Each structure stands twice: as C-alpha cells, then as structure tokens.
C-alpha cells in the first residue's frame, strides 16, 4: 500500500536538505592534495547541500586552485599563515571553529588518516559534540555506518548533535573527479595563532615505490619472514610489480620494519587491486585493514592459517622459495 507524504513533511524534508552544508578539511602537502581528501569530498556530497573545502597552510595556492576544479565543491576557503605550516591540530582547530561559526556548517569532516584522527576529536571537543570515526557509508545526513569488532560487525550510528563531526574511511568511497568543478575561492576567517605547540621539522622516507594507502598493488610481510633483512625479498618482488610494501603488526612489533608500514586495524587501511600477503597468518586485526582488497593472494606454509579464509588465491609453500621464483619470472617478462 502506497501512502503519500503529507505536504508538511515534504516541506520539512526539502528544508532540511536545503540547509545542509558540509565543511571538508583538506589534507595536503602545500603543493599536492592527499588522495584521501578526494574520497572525503565524495562522502560529503552524499549528505546533500553545499560542500565547501578549507585549505590551511603556507603557499598552498596550487592546492586551492586544484580543489576549485574538483567536482561537487561549491566553495574553497583558503587560510595561509606560518602557524599552519605543520597542520597542527592546536592551530587548525580555532580556524575551523571560526569558519563553522561564520557559515554555520551542519557537518565537518576529514579523511580518517593520521591527520584527520588527530584533528577532528579536538574540533568535536571544542564544539562539545561527539565525533563519529572512520565511517564507511552514509544513510542520511544524521545516520552513518562504521565497522566495529575489527571489521566483523557494522554499527549504524544516528547522530543528533547540532554539528556532525566525522572522519571518512577513504577506501569506502570513490575519489571525486578532479575536473569539471567550478568552485569559487575566498579567504577564510583569520584567527590568532594559539602557540601551544611549535612545528619544527618533518623528515620523510624517500621511496620510488607508491604510497601504501594509494597503491594499486601491495605486498605485505609478516612474522614468517623471520627478520628485517628478509624483507628484501618483498622489496624485490614489489619493484617488479610497481607495488607498495606493507607489514603485519607482528612484523612491526618484532622490529623488522618501521610502524608506518603497518597494515591493519591500528595501522593503515588499504584496498588495492591486488594484495599479496606473505608469511602473514591473518590475525583479525590485520584482516580489518586489507579485507576490502579486490584480489587477495596469500603465501603461507601453514594450510590452516586464517589468511586463507579471505584469500582469493592461496599458495601453501615456503615463502623463501616461492617469492624469489615469482620475482625471477616477473623479471623475464
């Protein structure tokens, strides 16, 4: 039986949609936009209403110009000051609060990266609202879906806060198109630096391999590699596949590789076209960070390893024999 909505209900729904507005906090490196910001913009457009982006930094004109071309954005707000050089949460929060107050945004969001996870809880606390972390779907402007229990269950969260503050899992939303947009650009509200923290320096490891969360192919190693030196087997294979290299928490805790390579619930969430798990047993925390990969290949000598339960292809064999053989075959192609 079909029941027509009352005119008053339709007017309220239309009014609610009309007054929805979302502020996306852009993550960037001054000259380039972090890919997860494009995924976050897609999530923001699902809410309905106007989407704006806030770009804070130093000499970030190029990023602002690039964002103006992104589909789905109505306005780009730019704030440039030496205080924003390191994108510290202590300095960005007053800027975000002032911007929200000026435009009365109903939603504030950022990618669920280290940047977003550090910034948004502080913003939410200052607004006296509860943040929603790592959402994977949007059901309505006040209803979101996130994973719990290491990805084994879905939790639907209805948020009644005056301002909804949430972080977005990048792998759950397509990247917004980087062309076709015609957003306007203007200066954001100026705020005085709080000077609680001081940005000194940042030293990043240089690599010819793609960044882990944005790579189309990822090769990850676990405790089965037995040492950090043996990760060279994975580096050689990754070079042939133009892949990024990751690791399980067990490998990181054992000191084989640095923690910025960790894939899993407490590490990085990846969803590449191809994920090759080498010597990884498949703890639930690791699976939570890679199970959305399009194709999963597992190499482990233990046929009962949990990783085989999520793998599309499994190789039960000694990794120290199989991986070099794979590398040699690829070299000949």
Curated annotation (Swiss-Prot):
N6-acetyllysine found at: 59, 62, 69, 75, 101, 139, 158, 164, 203, 226, 232
Classification via InterPro entries: DHS-like_NAD/FAD-binding_dom, ETF_a/b_N, ETF_a/FixB, ETF_alpha_N, ETF_asu_C, ETF_asu_C_CS, Rossmann-like_a/b/a_fold
Cofactor: FAD
Subcellular location per the Swiss-Prot or TrEMBL entry: Mitochondrion matrix
Keywords: Acetylation, Electron transport, FAD, Flavoprotein, Mitochondrion, Phosphoprotein, Transit peptide, Transport
Record GO terms (molecular function): electron transfer activity; flavin adenine dinucleotide binding
Keyword Cell wall biogenesis/degradation recorded: no
Main localisation: mitochondrion
Modified residues annotated as N6-succinyllysine in this record: 59, 69, 158, 187, 203, 216, 226, 232, 301
Xref: Gene3D superfamilies: HUPs, TPP-binding domain
A UniProt-annotated Pfam family: ETF
Function: Heterodimeric electron transfer flavoprotein that accepts electrons from several mitochondrial dehydrogenases, including acyl-CoA dehydrogenases, glutaryl-CoA and sarcosine dehydrogenase. It transfers the electrons to the main mitochondrial respiratory chain via ETF-ubiquinone oxidoreductase (ETF dehydrogenase). Required for normal mitochondrial fatty acid oxidation and normal amino acid metabolism.
Protein name according to UniProt: Electron transfer flavoprotein subunit alpha, mitochondrial
Gene from which the chain derives: ETFA
């Amino acid at each position: 039986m079909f029941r027509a909505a009352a005119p008053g209900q339709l007017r309220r729904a239309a009014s609610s949609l009309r007054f929805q507005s979302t502020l996306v906090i852009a993550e960037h490196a001054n000259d380039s936009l972090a890919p997860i910001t494009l995924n976050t913009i897609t999530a923001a457009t699902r809410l309905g209403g106007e989407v704006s982006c806030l770009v804070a930094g130093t000499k970030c004109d190029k990023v602002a110009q690039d964002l103006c071309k992104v589909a789905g954005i109505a306005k780009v707000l730019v704030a440039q000051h030496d205080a924003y050089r390191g994108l510290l949460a202590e300095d960005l929060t007053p800027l975000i609060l002032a911007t929200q107050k000026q435009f009365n945004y109903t939603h504030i969001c950022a990618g669920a990266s280290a940047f977003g996870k550090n910034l948004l809880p502080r913003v939410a606390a200052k607004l006296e609202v509860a943040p929603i972390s790592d959402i994977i779907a949007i059901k309505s402007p006040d209803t979101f879906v996130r994973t719990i229990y290491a990805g084994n269950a879905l939790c639907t969260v209805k948020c009644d806060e005056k301002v909804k503050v949430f972080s977005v899992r990048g792998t759950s939303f397509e990247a917004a198109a980087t062309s076709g947009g015609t957003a306007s650009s203007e200066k954001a509200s100026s705020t005085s630096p709080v000077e609680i923290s001081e940005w000194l320096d940042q030293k990043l490891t240089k690599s010819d391999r793609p960044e882990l969360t944005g790579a189309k192919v990822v090769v990850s190693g676990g405790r089965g590699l037995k040492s950090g030196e043996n990760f060279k087997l994975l580096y050689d294979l990754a070079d042939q596949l133009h892949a990024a290299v990751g690791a399980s928490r067990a490998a990181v805790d054992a000191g084989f590789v640095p923690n910025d390579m960790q894939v899993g619930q407490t590490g990085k969430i990846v969803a590449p076209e191809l994920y090759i798990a080498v010597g990884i047993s498949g703890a639930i925390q690791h699976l939570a960070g890679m199970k959305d990969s399009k194709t999963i290949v597992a190499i482990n000598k233990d046929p009962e390893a949990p990783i085989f339960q999520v793998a599309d292809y499994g190789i039960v064999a000694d990794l120290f024999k199989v991986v070099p053989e794979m590398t040699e075959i690829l070299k000949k192609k």
